[in-house]
Amino acid sequence: DKVLYVNSPRFTNLDEPSTQRFAFVERLRAATSELDVRDAGDLLDPMRMVADDFAMKNLLAAIEVTGAGLMEGMKVARPELTTRQVMETVDYVFRLRGADLGFHTGVSLASDLDEELQWETTAEEEAARKGDARIGEGMLVHFDAGAQMNHYSADIQRTVPAGPRFTDEQRRVYEGVLAVQKAVIGAVRPGVTWQELHQIAVSMLSDLGGWDESYTYGIGHFIGLEVHEHGDYVGPLQPGMVLAIEQGAVVNGTRVAFEDDVLVTESGHEWLTRFIPIEIDDVEALRREEPLVRLEMLLRGR
């Protein structure tokens, strides 16, 4: 018999019907009876879904560097600068620490949005990430970044105020979305499925007043040799898997989103990115710290 293994990407929106996801494979099977078309994921996924010691060492290093870069960017972001200048600050720290970019660092305005933040194509998303918007007074700034160490990438998001403190409305949205993030991370353990985690987020965002309407993507993905790692997104989680848990909402033009890297352990989980400020008091305290990258250097390039 002739066997054809097809490596069909598994990273997709969890709400998308599986019949659409694997339509290509079904067409191959219908085209000829001479081929036994099988999913290459059955062979490859177990090798990549569970991190060995080498993978964990490099993922932890990537997370540490990403945290350092993000915290510097979170300190720097303010009305005197543009999103590109803040982005370059994050990337500078990555390179200073010997890391590559797992993907193009995204720094964008998260206030006064008139539509959901989503793109039809990868090219559109990359173009948006490379934008250069002026940060305004009272705005929120959103970060999405991941350093890469020895081909292993982190993937982390944070949202911060451009000023010293969140406004009351920003605080309201932030606290709501943060509660969802904590609940989903708290539910991570062996035996739970991605779909169950996704439904926790959708249900809680809906209960907040229909906030789930702007949540147009899945709850997360594996990380490893690829930022959006291949794997089994249907079966139960296993110890040793490293996940990126992400969700957020756009409420009256204000966007808050988080993404955290989480290790599935034998007894539950370990929140690997917890050291990066996420509580409101911690974020505001970080905003009061002096950045290592001097603002004069950035302002000179305006």
Q: Predicted regions span which residues?
A:
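Active-site neighborhoods and metal-handling regions in enzymes and metal-associated proteins
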Residues: D1-R302
